[in-house]
Amino acid sequence: MRILTLTILVISIFLSCTDMSIPLPKPRVYPKVVYPVKDYQSFSSNNCPFSMMIPKYFIFNQDNNKTENEKQYTCWFDLVCNKLNTNIHMSYVPIDNRADLDEMIQDAFEMVNKHNVKASYRDEIKINIAEKKIYGLVFKIDGPVASPTQFFLTDSTSHFLRGSLYFNDVVNRDSIAPVYDFLELDVSKMIETLEWK
């Protein structure tokens, strides 16, 4: 009897240790994004000597978080899109001479260069809309960077506008790619429709 009980116990232990299920990795999924309808409206502000078309799903927020040296600039603002958890920071600075322009261009490059640590690739696209006196560069930065698109626009004599697209979350380039592509069209539209006053 003892041998029978011991045999049954040993067989039970061996049978209970086998796992017939095969472990499978979980499929990679990303949250579903509900895109707003692409529709644009004219943007113009008394503080800003330019106008452009901006998406209707962006909210204008005046930037009041400036240092003492920056308070003179009244045309700094964010275009916020809560639905896509992103914003475009815009800063306009009037320029009086070539030295001011060179300094602003240098600042724009320094802001872009701060992303080089995490960037895997950077593309610079020249903007030249001579009939509207709009010149500048668009920087497209690939990799887990805070701002994958930055740009600056100028008429090279009195206006300088800088913009940066930010995602308000940890950036996994694969997961934000569809949202990034969606917003790239908006940034392009803003640049194409810019008019100096």
Residue ranges and their predicted role:
Residues T18-S21:
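Bacterial signal peptide processing site
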Residues I13-S16:
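C-terminal motif of bacterial Sec signal peptides marking the signal peptidase cleavage site
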Residues P25-N46:
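Post-signal peptide N-terminal segment of mature Sec-exported envelope proteins
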Residues N46-Q106:
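Secretory pathway targeting signatures of secreted, lumenal, and periplasmic proteins
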Residues M1-T5:
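Positively charged n-region of N-terminal signal peptides that target proteins for export
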Residues P23-K26, S120, I125-K197:
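Short, well-structured beta-strand
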Residues Y57-E68, N113-I127:
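Short secondary-structure junctions
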Residues N61, M111-K114, M190-T193, K197:
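Structured segments of extracytoplasmic/periplasmic soluble domains
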